[in-house]
Amino acid sequence: MKRLLLLAGEESGAIYARRIAARAKELFPGVEVRGYGEYGFTTADLAVFGFWEVLKRIFFFLRVRRTMERAIDEWRPDAVCTVDYPGMNLRLAAYAKSKGIRAVHVVCPQVWAWHRGRIPKIEASLDALCCFFPFEPSFFRAGFAHFVGHPLAEEFAAGDARRGERAGDPRLVALLPGSRLGEIRGILPTLLEAVRGLDCRCVIPAANAQARAEIEREVERWRGAGAGCPPVDVRVGGAREAFAEAACAAVASGTATLEAAFAHCPTVLVYRVGRILAFFARRLIKIKHVGLANIVWECCHSGDDPSGGASDPLGGYPMLELLQEDMTVKNVRKSIENFISDDKLRLIASSRLAEATDLMRTDGDSISKIVRFLV
């Protein structure tokens, strides 16, 4: 392999893409790797939140698609590897395959959650699909989708080695409102109000400098709105360190919830989208949970009653989920208060997260497995 077109689109996928690029260069010395960045598009440009935000920038996304299709035609890579970001990336992978170029997609589209009618189209668009979760290949034809293990599993100690051994600061709360600007504006104000008046300290790891600037603006608005604001440390990066240090976290749905899970950090998962998107989501999505640790837990405890009883604040799952109208200041505050005041609850949450993440492990190096599917 001499040329690899490697396309992510959002920062969460770009993290894996950088590792894939590094491993490809180790396994195939001299390979040239290009991505969206070489054609003038950054993750900040591409990461758009919400139906209306996409619609408002539809001409930009059409330009991205035309530019990348032209790049495939002119540069003629030996393989195209797309990472997550399925709305754009699966179209580009299908285009590459139609030109006789090997196309591999990393991160399974969530067909187990909604719109299973896409499965034949996905199978026709790709040569291989690399999955991070053990239950995903069963939705596709034999030999097409492969469980490679989750890359995060290799970066954290196995669950049995750390179960119940967290030494987090009992008053430190990590707040992660998401990496997109729309998420920060829509979610962070609720998280900040939830900690107003609590005896705690907060850390907010931003995905990048642009996100940090937006977070700092929201924090200043919050401080100006009243008293009782605990200390807040806003930093670029450092999410994993924050999860290791914190007693608990409030995290917007996404890759950060998995990092919290692998760190065994007691977590309340929060998310809220616009009314139109929520309307369609309620009619299309076929699963009870959005947190991947909870989904893996449920798949591997099928037939059990995971309710945990009325006395279990986590409802029998590894993570508490507060979505849409449940994502209120009152509910988030209660969840954080429960975690910082109850050592036993934190231990229960950590143990369940350890068990759930152990199920995402497999023998060998997931990134090397992905690279080998490219040839």
Where does each model-flagged region fall?
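Nucleotide-activated sugar donor-binding and catalytic core shared by glycosyltransferases
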Residues: 1-375
